[in-house]
Amino acid sequence: MRSVALTLCAIIAGYLLVSNLQNVFSPEVCTLVITGESIRINGCNLSPAHFRAISHLKVLQIHL
């Protein structure tokens, strides 16, 4: 019973370690921020089709 618990803990710890290492070595994060004044795109690899689609986006408008 104890060896099963230790094995499970080792598997979980290994998964967390690998997951964190993947995040460190692949920091490419694509962020799209839409506000009431602008649209900002950071860290994205964009194709011409993406540029055409993004050109039709509008700023966020909320009518209260």
From Swiss-Prot:
Cytoplasmic side: 28-64
UniProt KW keywords: Host endoplasmic reticulum, Host membrane, Membrane, Transmembrane, Transmembrane helix, Transport, Viral movement protein
UniProt key word Endoplasmic reticulum: no
Superkingdom of the organism of origin: Viruses
GO cellular component, one term: host cell endoplasmic reticulum membrane
Predominant location: host cell
Lumenal side: 1-4
InterPro entries: TGBp3 (IPR003411)
Pfam families: TGBp3 (PF02495)
Subcellular location: Host endoplasmic reticulum membrane
Membrane-spanning residues: 5-27
GO biological process per UniProt: transport of virus in host, cell to cell
Homology family: Belongs to the Tymovirales TGBp3 protein family.
Other facts: TGBp1, TGBp2 and TGBp3 seem to act together for cell-to-cell propagation. TGBp1 is the main movement protein that physically cross the plasmodesma with the viral genome. TGBp2 and TGBp3 would facilitate TGBp1 function.
Name of the protein: Movement protein TGBp3
Organism: Lily symptomless virus (LSV)
Lineage of the species this protein comes from: Viruses, Riboviria, Orthornavirae, Kitrinoviricota, Alsuviricetes
